[in-house]
Amino acid sequence: MLLTIDVGNTHTVLGLFDGEDIVEHWRISTDSRRTADELAVLLQGLMGMHPLLGDELGDGIDGIAICATVPSVLHELREVTRRYYGDVPAVLVEPGVKTGVPILTDHPKEVGADRIINAVAAVELYGGPAIVVDFGTATTFDAVSARGEYIGGVIAPGIEISVEALGVKGAQLRKIEVARPRSVIGKNTVEAMQSGIVYGFAGQVDGVVNRMARELADDPDDVTVIATGGLAPMVLGESSVIDEHEPWLTLMGLRLVYERNVSRM
């Protein structure tokens, strides 16, 4: 089986693939202080819960693919693969890795690995032109051309960051649960804040995507818009531009990149 690991700033998502099918997944907090040994213990606990894997770390795993937006965690995971997974092929998404997607930006090495991986999956699953909206710590919008090229995108503050900022900077406001309110017009402070988050982000998505689509294609209706990320369901029902919801888009992209690189190892 293939173990895929997507390390974000807030959460780390792990997926287990049997061929092209994802058969198990986990979401844990990202902690840059964890050592390779601590990560190995954590992985062993998660892997041990799956009936098709053995008790020892690495049993049943024949490949690993990792992308990370936190360099220190990527370093420790590299140590995990070296020390605990022995001869299991491991592909870490970093400069030099073959993705199959040309990166047509001013500074390609500055583009986050997760954003490139999302583009890889979008091209494979839906073709171009496409826009991927990833609701993570930041909300990112990434554009793929009709020729399958990554051409850039937009980075905006994420939902959780915005909620925390309201609670910290607003003297009479507090941190709230991110939930859909009863109506757009809030009847109390909490509902008013929830409305601002849910409908504000839905409006942001619609506005940004519409502008990007006009730049991306002669006919904006030709652009496929894919939503992913842990908080995507909060906006899905309120946005008018999202065509597809694929919660495991990044993990699928990691599987594709692994397959394109493992033969070179």
Swiss-Prot record:
Subcellular location: Cytoplasm
GO biological process, alphabetically ordered: coenzyme A biosynthetic process
Active site (UniProt): D114
Binding site for K(+): D134
Amino-acid positions noted as binding substrate in the UniProt annotation, renumbered to this chain: G112, A113, D114, R115, T189
Pathway listed: Cofactor biosynthesis; coenzyme A biosynthesis; CoA from (R)-pantothenate: step 1/5
Binding residues annotated for ATP, in chain numbering: D6, V7, G8, N9, T10, H11, T12, V13, T137
Cofactor binding, per record: A monovalent cation. Ammonium or potassium.
Sample GO molecular function, one term: metal ion binding
GO CC terms of this entry: cytoplasm
Cofactor: NH4(+); K(+)
Catalytically driven reaction(s): (R)-pantothenate + ATP = (R)-4'-phosphopantothenate + ADP + H(+)
InterPro entries on file: ATPase_NBD, Type_III_PanK
EC number(s) from the headed UniProt entry: 2.7.1.33
Alphabetical list of Pfam families matching this protein: Pan_kinase
Subunit and interaction comment: Homodimer.
HAMAP family: Pantothen_kinase_3 (MF_01274)
Function comment: Catalyzes the phosphorylation of pantothenate (Pan), the first step in CoA biosynthesis.
Protein name per Swiss-Prot or TrEMBL: Type III pantothenate kinase
Organism: Streptomyces coelicolor (strain ATCC BAA-471 / A3(2) / M145)
Lineage: Bacteria, Bacillati, Actinomycetota, Actinomycetes, Kitasatosporales
